[in-house]
């Protein structure tokens, strides 16, 4: 119902516990006296507001006898339009049983479900599938790094516009749009599985030494698999469009709906759930990788998960996420523009904005014409920009490790892809979630100010920097590999898989099937010079190998059998995996403990009306300088440590087969330490520059609160009069 006093929503205006105190004075007097307390604002108001107020003759409340003047009407309508509270439902459908969802806790639950779904896909399933996608579609790590960065490119391009226009719009419905785009992106990402045909194992070729072998032809279908790169990029772009409203408008909506001291706890919980998503994604993806990629062919194939040619069903998780994401569209669209009680909560908040950015016009940012000025205003806030650069440096390494940690563990410690992904998820996800929750809890528990939250983040980053040298503490040496790091019993040259012992075998470089013999790994049984095999044994064993001198004997209940090589990689002798996992787990905790405090600091150091835009700028810069180049830099860095590339029948270089473990460890620790130092520098500089607003500066924020309080008083008074 709309009147001269504004918009009334009597059913959903929360009754104030101090209503009698607020009704003891005229509402108009409350507003005018609050506005006139600031000399600068007083000079800018119409003449009617500058007239001295006559003393009240009666303390009894009375309704205004005349319509408010133009200035008061504008201020009142502005405040009411900002806090349109309503019931939970769709159009005229508002069941009473669903109104329990119409609370900050109810919204947080739905927010967490969407954040979990987004985390499952973007930071869980995508990361755990990278190694499989590399092999299936013959891509380099730099190309799969581009796939990971495509999400951030989309986020970066849209964040400013979504955050600016969404701040004035219906935020929950923006999140319904986010759920739709996340589901669509997950669906598109799975499409290459259905159009790329059946996975070819290459079993038509003999894996043993054959002196007469037919030459293989180069088919265009093999080399064209990498063209599916563009489909993966499209899926990531759609996922980025869905993630943009979630972490800008969703975070601002949570901050709107709860008191200041609870904001960090709610935001920390939401961010922790966004990290729980990757945990589920890693576990789910790890289990799905134990299913053969072509599910219908799984029972008929004779290879096992230990076979290097094995590829898991990476695509199933994306289809499940598509269904779950779309199931959240309707629940989000049922939320009102603001939750009941938001206006009263906002009336009790105090500004902590950086002094140079505290005196923004209350009506600023309501028009598209204000966008350039709003952007310039935030870019001139030195504290805000330092915090943004700090998070960008941190995001570079966190995104890089989230993408390539399973690959690092797989190659450093000689594990299977699925087990390495499970271990990576077991370290990354619980550590990140625990860090987010601890950070938010400590900020809320001790009610830290803006400056104290920045100091807390600086401390946690320092601890993480100290422990980042774990890659040097727990690195593993390179395992012996014939023709790469080890010669063929003193013959042949390093860097050449062909030696005198296998020169007549006509081995195929495109057929990678490692075997282990005498503690040395060989590219395939053919390159080991093996001419015979026993297929019924698991694992498959080979004998009459010209490149292997010493035989290995195995005894079973039925027979004693001598062989020279067995299928699979050699067992690693490095026992530093537990040390690495424990120390890296602590590094992750302290790294993510700074996440919530920095977000809270950003929300506090800018003007109240520019928080969504501030988050949009943060995520744009964070992705431009952090999460977009992060996986690409890590991909090129890891590729630079490759010592044996896969080359197909057409002579095209594919995925890397063998890495230099020592060089990889040193390169990764160099990136980590550099980024940590940059993070701490900008964080410390923000602390040095920050100037909390003096008490007089807070008046501009309290003037808005006075108007909101006045509106609440009038609504409560009208309700009493109508009920009477």
Curated annotation (Swiss-Prot):
Residues 44-60 have a biased composition (Low complexity). Residues 127-145, 198-224, 296-311, 400-419, 472-580, 639-672 are extracellular. Keywords: Cell membrane, Developmental protein, Differentiation, Disulfide bond, Ion transport, Membrane, Phosphoprotein, Spermatogenesis, Transmembrane, Transmembrane helix, Transport. Residues 495-549 form the Kazal-like domain. It comes from the Eukaryota. Mediates the transport of organic anions such as steroids (estrone 3-sulfate, chenodeoxycholate, glycocholate) and thyroid hormones (3,3',5-triiodo-L-thyronine (T3), L-thyroxine (T4)), in the kidney. Capable of transporting cAMP and pharmacological substances such as digoxin, ouabain and methotrexate. Transport is independent of sodium, chloride ion, and ATP. Transport activity is stimulated by an acidic extracellular environment due to increased substrate affinity to the transporter. The driving force for this transport activity is currently not known. Belongs to the organo anion transporter (TC 2.A.60) family. This is Solute carrier organic anion transporter family member 4C1. The lineage of its organism: Eukaryota, Metazoa, Chordata, Craniata, Vertebrata. The gene is SLCO4C1.
């Amino acid at each position: 119902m709309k009147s001269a006093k504004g918009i009334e929503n009597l059913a959903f205006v929360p009754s104030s516990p101090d209503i009698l105190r607020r009704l003891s004075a005229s509402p108009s007097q409350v507003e005018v006296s609050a506005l006139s307390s600031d000399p600068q604002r007083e000079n800018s108001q119409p003449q009617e507001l500058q007239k001295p107020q006559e003393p009240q003759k009666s303390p009894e409340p009375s309704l205004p006898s005349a319509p408010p003047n133009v200035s008061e009407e504008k201020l009142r309508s502005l405040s009411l339009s900002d806090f349109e509270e309503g019931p939970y439902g769709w159009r005229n459908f508002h069941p009473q049983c669903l109104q329990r969802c119409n609370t900050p806790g109810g919204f947080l639950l739905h927010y967490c479900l969407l954040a979990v779904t987004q985390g499952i896909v973007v930071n869980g399933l995508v990361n755990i599938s990278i190694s499989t996608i590399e092999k299936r579609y013959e891509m380099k790590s730099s190309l799969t790094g581009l796939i990971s960065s495509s999400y951030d490119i989309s986020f970066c391009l849209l964040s400013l516009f979504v955050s600016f226009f969404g701040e004035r719009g219906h935020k929950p419905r923006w999140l319904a749009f986010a759920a739709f785009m996340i589901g669509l992106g997950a669906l598109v990402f799975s499409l290459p599985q259905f159009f790329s045909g059946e996975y070819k194992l290459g079993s038509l070729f003999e894996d043993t030494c054959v002196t007469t072998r037919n030459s293989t032809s180069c088919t265009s279908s093999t080399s064209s698999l990498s063209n599916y790169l563009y489909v993966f990029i499209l899926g990531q772009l759609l996922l980025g469009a869905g993630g943009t409203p979630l972490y800008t408008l969703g975070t601002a909506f949570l901050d709107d709906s709860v008191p200041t001291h609870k904001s960090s706890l709610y935001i920390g919980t939401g961010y922790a759930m966004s990290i729980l998503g990757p945990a589920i994604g890693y576990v789910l993806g790890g289990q799905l990788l134990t299913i053969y990629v072509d599910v219908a062919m799984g029972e008929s194939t004779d290879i096992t998960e230990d076979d290097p040619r094995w590829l898991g069903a990476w695509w199933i998780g994306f289809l499940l996420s598509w269904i779950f994401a779309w199931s959240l569209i309707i629940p989000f669209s049922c939320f009102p523009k603001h939750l009941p009680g938001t206006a009263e909560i906002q009336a009790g908040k105090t500004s902590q904005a950086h002094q140079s950015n505290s005196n923004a016009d209350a009506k600023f940012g309501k028009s598209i014409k204000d966008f350039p000025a709003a952007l310039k205003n935030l870019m001139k806030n030195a504290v805000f920009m330092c915090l943004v650069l700090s998070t960008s440096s941190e995001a570079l390494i966190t995104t890089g490790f989230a993408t390539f940690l399973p690959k690092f563990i797989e190659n450093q410690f000689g594990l299977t892809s699925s087990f390495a992904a499970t271990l990576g998820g077991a370290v990354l996800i619980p550590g990140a979630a625990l860090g987010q929750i601890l950070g938010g809890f400590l900020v809320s528990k001790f009610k830290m100010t803006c400056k104290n939250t920045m100091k807390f983040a600086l401390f946690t980053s320092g601890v993480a920097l100290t422990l980042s040298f774990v890659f040097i503490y727990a690195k593993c040496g390179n395992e012996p590999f014939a023709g790469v790091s080890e010669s063929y019993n003193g013959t042949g040259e390093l860097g050449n898989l062909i030696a005198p012992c296998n020169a007549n075998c006509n081995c195929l470089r495109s057929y990678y099937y490692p075997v282990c013999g005498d503690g040395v790994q060989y590219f395939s049984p053919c390159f080991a010079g093996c001419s015979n095999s026993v297929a019924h044994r698991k694992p498959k064993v080979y004998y009459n190998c010209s490149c292997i001198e010493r035989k290995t004997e195995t005894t079973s209940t039925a027979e004693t059998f001598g062989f020279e090589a067995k299928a699979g990689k050699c067992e690693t002798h490095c026992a530093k995996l537990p040390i690495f996992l424990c120390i890296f787990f602590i590094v992750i905790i302290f790294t993510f403990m700074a996440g919530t405090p920095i977000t809270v600091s950003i929300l506090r150091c800018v003007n109240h009306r520019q928080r969504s835009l501030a988050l949009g700028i943060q995520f744009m810069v964070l992705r431009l300088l952090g999460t977009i180049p992060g996986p690409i830099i890590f991909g090129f860095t890891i590729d630079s440590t490759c010592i044996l590339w896969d080359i197909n029948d057409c002579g095209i270089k594919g995925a890397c087969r063998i890495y230099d473990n020592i060089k990889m460890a040193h390169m990764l620790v160099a990136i980590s330490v550099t980024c940590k130092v940059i993070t701490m520098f900008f964080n410390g500089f923000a602390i040095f520059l920050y100037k909390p607003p003096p008490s007089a500066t807070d008046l501009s924020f309290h003037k808005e609160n006075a108007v909101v309080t006045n509106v609440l008083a009038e609504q409560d008074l009208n309700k009493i009069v109508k009920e009477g």
